[in-house]
Amino acid sequence: TLNISVKKTISLATKGMRIDGRKALEFRKIEIETGISKNAEGSARVRVGQTEVVAGVKMDVGEPYPDSPDAGNLIVSLELTPLSSSRYDLGPPGIGAIEIARLVDRAVRESKLIDIKKLCIKEGEKVWNVYIDIYSINDAGNVLDAAAIAAVAALQTAFMPKYDEKKEKVDYHERSDKKVPLNDLPVMITFHKIGNTIMID
């Protein structure tokens, strides 16, 4: 049987309303702060309503994948920390965190946000790896959209570290004036259909 809060949510949804007072298509308040980490190539803190996440971008040089010898690599990871909710445990990322990271990875990758061809240093040998690490600080719902927004904001402010081709070494103490090559910025929106009502999360 449905619990009382679920029944109330469904009842309000049929009227285009919800428990927190927002209308069906009304977003949570979104706040974005960038440049929160001195050690990351780019970083952001995002609040979507009471949900808060932080994201950082780090880069290093590695080998390309065999099926894309002239393109850089993207790796997204996410941790749902016990700090953010009692539902989460210490230890390796759980299924929920892995799934959210996979969805953010797909959103960034399939939207063509990063021009990965411009991350190639030497075809078939060396490319830039772009790591996006995301951590939940408070989970009050819709961590997925908050994580996606934080990832995009961190990428948008990221500058590439310098790479010494002779020494084949990245100099993390000095930033170049090159930003991570980006295309048009994607926007991730989660919505649900409850009865006949479409609701923004």
Tell where the protein language model's regions lie, with residue ranges:
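Polyanion-binding surfaces on beta-sheet-dominated domains and ring/shell assemblies
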Residues: T1-D201
